[in-house]
């Protein structure tokens, strides 16, 4: 006789009530650090033409552009190392401590880029020092986005995780807007000659005060409820084992959660390739290939990004209602179908059509960024969440980070301005496969954590849904048992000796 496993019901005491004040602080601190990360990426992408002339003088303009963007891409090689390092520490000692460390390293390394003398002053050491600073950034960023997304996800109520998580990439886009705006403002005030001489350094100097503010906010945060629950469980069951912190098993990650790892890699590749193509490569594409002035190209991208800021939280809010998968599928299909039309518009040399083409790509990007920060942390349980997510995220970013360099090389080598569109179509297929195979995570507790609600009333509603789900599961199991027993009866009738 098949036996049914008893399901232990939860009570109101098992539901975590999230404090609104702590949630707002967590979102602000996480988003600010993420904004600073993308502020640097935005600045670097928008001043790539200047950096090419400062650190790679004497080379052909095309070579200068590719070399500057290659320096942008090389640090992605070290990001997986940073991800593994900070991920392991984050699962062992907590999320808050690691986020404080990453923002310090990131702000100092960004600030130091502004201090590097030009190639004319110190020769080959100029690009070498630039590369060292970028690699330090890459190491810290390896634990930044994953840690920030986990921090927000573990602080968010289950029914609002999509909306709350969307503010993390709101910070990313805002960082790009700030970086681009600073570049345009400074270059306009000081003129192109002075900007190439010393003005390009100012945006990098701004990173230090931003880092100090971010450190202050993150230092004041408490550990997330989900991680604290995990520590409490370990403390109750294994006080001796807790002395060295919770254990992280990479064997468990690779063998038990390989499907989640692949899903994470696919989603991040689809999102970040589109991200880097639109927000990092397009300014250079507009200026170098379409012969727009640098400021003109940047202003177009700034306008697009400001529009994205308004769409971003709407996507997160809608994902709490309709789920995360529909947005991944919609974004992937739209990217595949509209990549070529978008670049036909961009290459039209008509300002209105260029804007329309970029806007198409921006809305598609919002489909991905609106759900990514809430989707990724839900794929793994608390005790391995940081390590697993950091490993998968940074491996995929290693691929996505090559986008500006690869796109520039493809265009230069083929003399075909449609190559970026073909590249995006390939990435769209990756996103589509990911969307089809991924599991829905909206409105569900994080793995390894109790349900989380924003107030008592919502907690009671969660309990009602929980009991309804249990009753449905019990009915489903009863039907399965009945079907199995019927199959057993038929087999016994066909082979009577089996039941002897």
From Swiss-Prot:
It comes from Escherichia coli (strain K12). Residues 1-37, 87-97, 143-169, 216-260, 319-325, 372-390, 438-500 are cytoplasmic. Induction: Induced by an increase in the osmolarity of the growth medium. Residues 453-498 form a coiled coil. This is Proline/betaine transporter. Keywords: Cell inner membrane, Cell membrane, Coiled coil, Membrane, Symport, Transmembrane, Transmembrane helix, Transport. GO terms for biological process: amino acid transport; cellular hyperosmotic response; cellular hyperosmotic salinity response; glycine betaine transport; osmosensory signaling pathway; proline import across plasma membrane. The keyword Cell membrane applies. NCBIfam families: 2A0106, PRK10642.1. The chain crosses the membrane at residues 38-58, 66-86, 98-118, 122-142, 170-190, 195-215, 261-281, 298-318, 326-346, 351-371, 391-411, 417-437. SUPFAM superfamilies: MFS general substrate transporter, Proline/betaine transporter ProP, C-terminal cytoplasmic domain. It is a multi-pass membrane protein. Pfam families: Osmo_CC, Sugar_tr. It is found in: Cell inner membrane. Proton symporter that senses osmotic shifts and responds by importing osmolytes such as proline, glycine betaine, stachydrine, pipecolic acid, ectoine and taurine. It is both an osmosensor and an osmoregulator which is available to participate early in the bacterial osmoregulatory response. GO terms for cellular component: plasma membrane. Its main location: membrane. It comes from the Bacteria. GO terms for molecular function: proline:proton symporter activity; protein homodimerization activity. Belongs to the major facilitator superfamily. Metabolite:H+ Symporter (MHS) family (TC 2.A.1.6) family. Residues 59-65, 119-121, 191-194, 282-297, 347-350, 412-416 are periplasmic.
């Amino acid at each position: 006789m098949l036996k049914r496993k008893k399901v232990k019901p939860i009570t109101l005491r098992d539901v975590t009530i999230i404090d609104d004040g702590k949630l707002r602080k967590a979102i602000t601190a996480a988003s600010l650090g993420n904004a600073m990360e993308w502020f640097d990426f935005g600045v670097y992408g928008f001043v790539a033409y200047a950096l090419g002339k400062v650190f790679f003088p004497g080379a052909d303009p095309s070579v200068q552009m590719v070399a500057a963007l290659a320096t942008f891409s090389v640090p992605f090689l070290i990001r997986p190392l940073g991800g593994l390092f900070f991920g392991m520490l984050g699962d062992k000692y907590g999320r808050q401590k690691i986020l404080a460390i990453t923002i310090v390293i990131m702000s100092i390394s960004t600030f130091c880029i502004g201090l590097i003398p030009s190639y004319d002053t110190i020769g080959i050491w100029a690009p070498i020092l630039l590369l060292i600073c970028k690699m330090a950034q890459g190491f810290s960023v390896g634990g930044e986005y994953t840690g920030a997304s986990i921090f927000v996800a573990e602080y968010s109520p289950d029914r609002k995780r999509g909306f709350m998580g969307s503010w993390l990439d709101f910070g990313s886009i805002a960082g790009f807007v700030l970086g681009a705006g600073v570049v345009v403002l400074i270059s306009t005030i000081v003129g192109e000659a002075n900007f190439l001489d010393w003005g390009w350094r100012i945006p990098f100097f701004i990173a230090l005060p931003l880092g100090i503010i971010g450190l202050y906010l993150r230092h004041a945060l408490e550990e997330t409820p989900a991680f604290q629950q995990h520590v409490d469980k370990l403390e109750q069951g294994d006080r001796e084992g807790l002395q060295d912190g919770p254990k992280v098993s990479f064997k468990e990650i690779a063998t038990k959660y390989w499907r989640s790892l692949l899903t994470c890699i696919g989603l991040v590749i689809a999102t970040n390739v589109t991200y880097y193509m639109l927000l990092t490569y397009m300014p250079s594409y507009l200026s170098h290939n379409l012969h727009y002035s640098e400021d003109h190209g940047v202003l177009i991208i700034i306008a697009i990004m400001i529009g994205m800021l308004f769409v971003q939280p709407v996507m997160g809010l809608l994902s709490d209602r309709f789920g995360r998968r529909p947005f991944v599928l919609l974004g992937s299909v739209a990217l595949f179908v509209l990549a070529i039309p978008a670049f036909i518009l961009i290459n039209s040399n008509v300002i209105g059509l260029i804007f329309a083409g970029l806007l198409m790509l921006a809305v598609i990007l919002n489909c991905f960024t609106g759900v990514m920060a809430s989707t990724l942390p839900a794929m793994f349980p608390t005790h391995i969440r940081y390590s697993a997510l950091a490993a998968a995220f940074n491996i995929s970013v290693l691929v996505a980070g090559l986008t500006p360099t690869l796109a520039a090389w493809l265009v230069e080598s083929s003399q075909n301005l449609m190559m970026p569109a073909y590249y995006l179509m390939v990435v769209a297929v990756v996103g589509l496969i990911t969307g089809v195979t991924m599991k829905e995570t909206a409105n569900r507790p994080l793995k390894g954590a109790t349900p989380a609600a924003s107030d008592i009333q919502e907690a009671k509603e969660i309990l009602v849904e929980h009991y309804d789900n249990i009753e449905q599961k019990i009915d489903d199991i009863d039907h399965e048992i009945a079907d199995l027993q019927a199959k057993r009866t038929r087999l016994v009738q066909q082979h009577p000796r089996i039941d002897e």
